[in-house]
């Protein structure tokens, strides 16, 4: 049985890649600990910046490259109004993209899981402006909506995954929470699309950050491509009470994005 050149390269490169990623992960935790220290010293801005650096380093250590593509002048339309970004949440690593690259407050359930790997992650995320939520708890979901209003007033922007869960795609479910929030604050709604290359994570590992870290040590390099659309790309209903119309418009947009890939 003959080995292909690509297989031989994989065999030779994998051990080197694994060692490099382990060393990078050690540095990740050093930066994260310094971030906690800054948080304890009330250096909140610096702590937030260090959390963003941690997020970037985590992706680097796992062999994940992030490519941000801004089409035309998509960001210009949000300058005069608050903005609510939507995105198709399909991968547990999205939280690191948002914190490390987009630098936008989000509604996230990451606090339920990342604390297993990053101690006091919830406190770090709250300091960075994120709204923590337990999507299985009705009270928590209601509280998240209230806090989202506060974040939108304070920061002028927030990013929301309308599908709300890694196990439910945006083509299956779209919550109207972003629509309600936008009407309340006269906010502009702009969609992000995340596309993943060589980054499949098994369903049983979606909420297990430790297993994901371990599995990525020897995995082939991957890419997350992030594309921003325009507010006018969403054919949103004129009636602010039309939640179903909002859901249909968002599903249609992401279906078209999926078909164009």
Task: Outline where the language-model segments fall.
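Soluble, non-transmembrane catalytic domains of enzymes that act on hydrophobic metabolites at membranes
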Residues: 1-6, 68, 72, 77, ...
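Membrane-anchoring hydrophobic helices of lipid-metabolizing enzymes
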Residues: 2-84, 93-97
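Catalytic core of membrane glycerolipid acyltransferases/transacylases, capturing the structured
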Residues: 32, 36-41, 77-138
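Residue-level preference for the first positions of well-ordered beta-strands
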Residues: 82-84, 155-161, 188-190
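A conditional alpha-helix N-cap/helix-loop micro-motif detector
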Residues: 88, 138-142, 171, 243
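A cross-family acyltransferase "interaction/gating" segment
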Residues: 120-122, 168-240
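Soluble extracytoplasmic domains of inner/organellar membrane proteins
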Residues: 148, 157, 164-166, 170
